[in-house]
Swiss-Prot record:
The lineage of its organism: Eukaryota, Metazoa, Chordata, Craniata, Vertebrata. The keyword Endoplasmic reticulum applies. SUPFAM superfamilies: Chaperone J-domain. GO terms for cellular component: endoplasmic reticulum; endoplasmic reticulum lumen. This is DnaJ homolog subfamily B member 9. It is found in: Endoplasmic reticulum lumen. SMART domains: DnaJ. Transmembrane segments: none annotated. GO terms for biological process: B cell differentiation; ERAD pathway; negative regulation of IRE1-mediated unfolded protein response; positive regulation of immunoglobulin production; response to endoplasmic reticulum stress; response to unfolded protein. PANTHER family: DNAJ HOMOLOG SUBFAMILY B MEMBER 9. Interacts with HSPA5/BiP; interaction is direct. Interacts with ERN1/IRE1 (via the luminal region). Interacts with DERL1.
Length: 223
């Protein structure tokens, strides 16, 4: 029968083995990119993983540790000089000789970023909307029934569909963001009034956009 002491020693051994395995995992492996990855590929991989594991969105016990690992990898690989050092010396380039990052590292200071910082480079909203808080962002992306407020619908109509959101840079974002309250239909109407033969007829031209398709038709009603 195992004694408490032997169980404790076994647990310590497992923990040490786990840490050794994690330590041997390269930053490229963490982000899931090849060593020859471009800056754009690295940035795209980071945003995808950061959104998946951010503690505010992912409530699993290991989400915070995973997110920190992802952020640390990105901090190094997104900087040309740091990446060059890492490619040459590996993890030892940023440790203090004890297997820990040096106290002078900027990682601790740069780690505490929020969703605004995470998405600001993606141009989700207009220029004025990039400065809005994380709560504002979450309110727009929560699942809502069709009876959402007109204010929220207005913002959805301002969503940028042209030449950016669904290109190769953001193809993963399209897959990750799905919510029932979203309708990519944008309508612009102009109403004109024509009178003839003593009757009144009201016509309006409706331009309707669904995805990348735009259709225009005239809707008339009257006596």
């Amino acid at each position: 029968m195992a004694t408490p002491q032997s169980i404790f020693i076994f647990a310590i051994c497992i923990l040490m083995i786990t840490e050794l395995i994690l330590a041997s995992k390269s930053y490229y492996d963490i982000l899931g990119v090849p060593k020859s990855a471009s800056e754009r590929q690295i940035k795209k991989a980071f945003h995808k993983l950061a959104m998946k594991y951010h503690p505010d969105k992912n409530k699993s016990p290991d989400a915070e540790a995973k997110f920190r690992e992802i952020a640390e990898a990105y901090e190094t690989l997104s900087d040309a000089n740091r990446r060059k050092e890492y490619d040459t010396l590996g993890h030892s380039a940023f440790t203090n000789g004890k297997g820990q990052r040096g106290s002078g590292s900027s990682f601790e200071q740069s780690f505490n970023f929020n969703f605004d910082d995470l998405f600001k480079d993606f141009g989700f909203f207009g220029q004025n909307q990039n400065t809005r808080s994380k709560k504002h962002f979450e309110n727009h992306f929560q699942t809502r029934p069709d009876g959402g407020s007109s204010r929220q619908r207005h913002h959805f109509q301002e969503f940028s569909f042209g030449g950016g959101l669904f290109d190769d840079m953001f193809e993963d974002m399209e897959k990750m963001f799905s919510f029932s309250g979203f309708d990519p239909t944008s309508r612009h109407t102009v109403q004109t009034e024509n009178r003839f033969h003593g009757s009144s007829k009201h016509c309006r031209t409706v331009t309707q956009r669904r995805g990348n398709m735009v259709t225009t038709y005239t809707d008339c009603s009257g006596q």
